[in-house]
């Protein structure tokens, strides 16, 4: 008789009676999306199909990705552990545990967290990074009791594009343009370029982004993404809204930019807004955002969302002037192993 236990069998043995661990399935996305959507603002709601699309574009790597079925066969919980979107040189891993609200307070979370941490220690990871959201009742308290400490907050906010009026900030845009800075869309820039020049533009944009990225007050130092990943997700994915991605040019030099991605059918998301170190304090970021919101409105979007790290008071202040409304914070967590 074969008495060999699989990894999921081992996890199942730690779960309450009737619950069963198994490998993650593609069909798990629907119930997880429904569960999350029930707890967040309607503008933050996503779809299982979008989740699939992004993972097809950039397949994640996991050391552990399991789901737990309830006695009735419905999805009850899950856990993940892997190097994350941008792997860290020191071997830090990103992990998480989720339990459906209907199945909490039964020990599922503790059992799965133990599995995650054992796997991370086996990989000799120095720490686990994770996150939760202030909208998820009790989640921060649960994590804190288990040794995870809050290391930062990322503030998501939105503005109703249809109601946006850029007139009060027209003078800022005028001053920037009068200084010799050209504000234009990526769509316009690409129309001016042949394939070779287009390829060079994307590489120039990525290079210009690097010092801006380094200056973001991340809760945990985050390496600038490789050009191949940038190209795959920004250039080749078809997700960027070129008509609402604005670049500030000083001659041929990229002084600043704000990039917009499509989310759902009628929302845009600011992926990055950055200003070169030599150009700060001149109103470029404000001018870019004014142009962005006007372009988003013309493109038929009803709302724009963005995320800023809590210490980034300058950018958050600009967004407040533009009418952005804050949503519950994403809370960054860390546990040293």
Language model feature labels by segment:
Residues 1-15, 101, 105, 113-197, ...:
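Acyl-donor-binding surface of acyltransferase catalytic domains
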Residues 105-118, 145, 275, 281-294, ...:
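Conserved acetyl-CoA-binding loop-helix of GNAT-fold acetyltransferases
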Residues 27, 137-138, 313-314:
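Short alpha-helical
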Residues 146-165, 244, 294, 299-337:
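Active-site/acyl-donor-binding loops of N-acyltransferases
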Residues 255-272, 280-291, 295-301, 305:
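Extended hydrophobic/aromatic segments used for targeting, binding, or gating
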Residues 2-54, 67-69, 74, 175-224:
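Short amphipathic alpha-helix that is part of the acyltransferase structural core
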Residues 219, 226-247, 251-252, 257:
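A mid-sequence, solvent-exposed acidic-amphipathic segment
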Residues 26-29, 36-135, 156, 250-268, ...:
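Conserved donor-binding loop and adjoining core beta-sheet/short helix segment
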């Amino acid at each position: 008789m074969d008495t060999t236990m699989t990894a999921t069998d081992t996890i199942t043995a730690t779960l309450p009676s009737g619950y069963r661990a198994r490998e993650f399935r593609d069909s798990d996305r629907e119930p997880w999306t429904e569960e999350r959507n029930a707890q967040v603002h309607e503008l933050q709601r996503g779809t299982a199909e979008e989740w699939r699309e992004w993972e097809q574009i950039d397949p994640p790597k996991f050391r552990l990705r399991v789901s737990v079925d309830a006695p009735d066969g419905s999805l009850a919980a899950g856990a993940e552990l892997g190097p994350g979107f941008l792997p860290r040189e020191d071997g830090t891993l990103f992990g998480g545990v989720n339990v459906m609200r209907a199945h909490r307070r039964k020990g599922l979370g503790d059992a799965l967290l133990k599995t995650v941490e054992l796997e991370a220690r086996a990989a000799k990871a120095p720490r686990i990074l994770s996150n939760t959201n202030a909208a998820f009742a009790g989640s921060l308290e649960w994590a804190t009791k288990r040794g995870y400490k809050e290391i930062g907050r990322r503030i998501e906010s939105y503005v109703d594009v249809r109601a946006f009026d850029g007139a009060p900030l027209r003078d800022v845009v005028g001053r920037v343009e009068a200084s010799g800075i050209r504000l234009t869309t990526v769509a316009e820039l690409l129309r001016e370029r042949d394939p070779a020049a287009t390829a060079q533009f994307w590489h120039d944009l990525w290079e210009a982004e690097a010092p801006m990225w380094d200056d973001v007050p991340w809760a945990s130092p985050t390496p600038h993404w490789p050009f191949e990943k940038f190209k795959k997700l920004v250039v080749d994915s078809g997700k960027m809204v070129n008509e609402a991605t604005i670049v500030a040019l000083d001659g041929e030099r990229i002084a600043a930019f704000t990039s917009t991605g499509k989310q759902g059918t009628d929302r845009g998301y600011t992926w990055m807004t950055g200003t070169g170190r030599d150009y700060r304090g001149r109103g470029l970021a404000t001018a870019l955002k004014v142009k962005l919101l006007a372009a988003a409105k013309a493109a038929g979007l009803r709302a724009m969302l963005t995320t800023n790290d809590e210490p980034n008071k300058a950018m958050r202040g600009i967004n407040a002037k533009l009418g952005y409304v804050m949503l519950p914070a994403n809370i960054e967590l860390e546990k040293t192993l």
